[in-house]
């Protein structure tokens, strides 16, 4: 379950970083910012049908797989630092976790961070223009299926005046204010 989180630094970002006392973020909190989460059962014989339904629902036409692992990913620390930098994209970000665990952090309307723990079978939809970041947990081993509408552009706009002035950010803010 997602929760509002304490401040995470590069040194502790792979920990839970829960507030004390804990404050859960319910489905309505995520819905207000356009984030959707569901489950995909990889142990079900019909898993491909479930994936095909998600692909159709979100009009995705391209997918690939990423393995984020200290042992296999070149420049792991550098990559994880980039993933954890607060940023946004022009396109939606859709991920299905096939193996391992990590955290997606997203900004609530009041700028607080909401942490979404993800494990095998978790699906996350982040709308275009939302500020977010990602990190593995301490296992440092995640395999994710990435779904895209088109071939990925991989353009990230870090949180700054530059990111705030992106047309997709302005559209996102209008969408979540409606």
From Swiss-Prot:
This is Acireductone dioxygenase 1. Its cofactor is Fe(2+); Ni(2+). Its EC number is 1.13.11.54, 1.13.11.53. It is found in: Cytoplasm; Nucleus. HAMAP family: Salvage_MtnD_euk. GO terms for molecular function: acireductone dioxygenase (Ni2+-requiring) activity; acireductone dioxygenase [iron(II)-requiring] activity; iron ion binding; nickel cation binding. Binds either 1 Fe or Ni cation per monomer. Iron-binding promotes an acireductone dioxygenase reaction producing 2-keto-4-methylthiobutyrate, while nickel-binding promotes an acireductone dioxygenase reaction producing 3-(methylsulfanyl)propanoate. One of its GO terms (biological process) is methionine metabolic process. Coiled coil: none annotated. It catalyses: 1,2-dihydroxy-5-(methylsulfanyl)pent-1-en-3-one + O2 = 4-methylsulfanyl-2-oxobutanoate + formate + 2 H(+); 1,2-dihydroxy-5-(methylsulfanyl)pent-1-en-3-one + O2 = 3-(methylsulfanyl)propanoate + CO + formate + 2 H(+).
